[in-house]
Amino acid sequence: MAVDSREKGKRGEYQVRDILRERTGLEWERVPGSGAFGQSHGLKGDIYLPPQSGHISKYCFEVKWYKDDNISSNLFNVGESTLEKWWQQCSREGEQMNSKPALIFKKDRGQWLIALDSSDPMVDNLMSRTHMVLNKKDMEIVIGLFEPWLHHASVEDLIK
């Protein structure tokens, strides 16, 4: 049975939204249309805090869910890897929103991972556990497990 990648992406965004809601008690939402709506309403990323929540996220959360383990291909080659392309999108949208980029991604049947810029103070929550650092071209990111990172973050760490 073929999988609709848009539906899969939407399910992933809802999963991450629900994890954020459960941990923070805030009413995080999925950006309607995940991009299409955002283009005309100034929203970037996939998950945000709506104005009626009374809060603004410090992070531009971009969510990716992939099937094949091709994320590491080209990491050490001249070409761009899938991970680098995702990070560029997340960074660009974060800059447009005046927010920090936070890429949340997973492989089928895997755990949610998070990638943060190495200069982000919240990387300390990643560095104290199993993690990896990717330094290539003009990016240096730290990757670790999303849920333990979030568990050790306070609401104040996530909102402006």
UniProtKB/Swiss-Prot annotation:
GO terms, molecular function: nucleic acid binding
InterPro entries: D14-like (IPR056931), tRNA_endonuc-like_dom_sf (IPR011856)
Keyword tRNA processing annotated: no
Induction record: Expressed in the early phase of the viral replicative cycle.
Record carries keyword Protein biosynthesis: no
Residue ranges the record marks as coiled coil: none
Keywords for the protein's UniProt record, in alphabetical order: Early protein
Origin: domain of life: Viruses
Any Pfam family: PDDEXK_15
Protein name, as recorded: Protein D14
